[in-house]
Amino acid sequence: MGVPATRRCVEWLLGIYFLSHIPITLFMDLQAVLPRELYPVEFRNLLKWYAKEFKDPLLQEPPAWFKSFLFCELVFQLPFFPIATYAFLKGSCKWIRTPAIIYSVHTMTTLIPILSTFLFEDFSKASGFKGQRPETLHERLTLISVYAPYLLIPFILLIFMLRSPYYKYEEKRKKK
């Protein structure tokens, strides 16, 4: 597979990632920050099932710091998702480079405390986490595996935008 074909495969991966992120954000993540009445009971039940099944304490009883991340997802990331979906599925949209770098760095930065919480938090002593929470290493790793793509794909995006010769910035100068 040549360089253009490889680039298109990565662009398709990124386009599908951003497309899939729209319903996940709207119907799951934002339930923690938007009024309950906006969501049909089916979506509320889906979130309850997920949080119980995967013992996700952040979506059962979201702490303030996590809600701040979700607010950023609502205000900054959600409007970017359709733009990025278009750019990557269409392909060859060099203008997406800077916004994609900003998105990837922002998203990876928010995932570090989330994944660290899942890995290192002593939930038995943490008063801020009620409800079910991961107790065993296996439960913690399962929960991390749910969130890990939201760290790994932005990392791939960042490397792709920084290293791809196609997306590198070239200064255009007027000829005299």
Swiss-Prot record:
Residues 10-158 form the EXPERA domain. GO terms for molecular function: cholesterol binding; oxysterol binding. GO terms for cellular component: endoplasmic reticulum; lysosome; nuclear membrane; plasma membrane; rough endoplasmic reticulum; rough endoplasmic reticulum membrane. Residues 31-68, 121-140 are lumenal. Cholesterol binds at residues 75, 77. The chain crosses the membrane at residues 10-30, 69-89, 100-120, 141-161. Pfam families: EBP (PF05241). It is a multi-pass membrane protein. The keyword Transmembrane helix applies. The record marks 150 as: Important for 20(S)-OHC binding and stereoselectivity. PROSITE patterns: EXPERA (PS51751). It is found in: Rough endoplasmic reticulum membrane; Nucleus membrane. Homodimer. Interacts with NPC1; the interaction impairs NPC1-mediated cholesterol transport. Interacts with PGRMC1 and LDLR; the interaction increases LDL internalization. Interacts with histatin 1/HTN1; the interaction induces HTN1-stimulating wound healing. Interacts with TSPO. Sigma receptors are classified into two subtypes (Sigma-1 and Sigma-2) based on their different pharmacological profile. Sigma-2 receptors are identified by radioligand-binding studies as a binding site with high affinity for di-o-tolylguanidine (DTG) and haloperidol. Sigma-2 receptor which contributes to ameliorate dysfunctional cellular processes and slow degenerative progression by regulating cell functions including cholesterol biosynthesis/trafficking, membrane trafficking, autophagy, lipid membrane-bound protein trafficking, and receptor stabilization at the cell surface. Forms a ternary complex with PGRMC1 receptor and low density lipoprotein receptor/LDLR at the plasma membrane, which increases LDLR-mediated LDL cholesterol internalization. PANTHER family: SIGMA INTRACELLULAR RECEPTOR 2. The EXPERA domain doesn't possess any sterol isomerase catalytic activity. The four transmembrane helices are all kinked owing to the presence of proline residues in each, creating a ligand-binding cavity near the center of the protein. This is Sigma intracellular receptor 2. The gene is Tmem97.
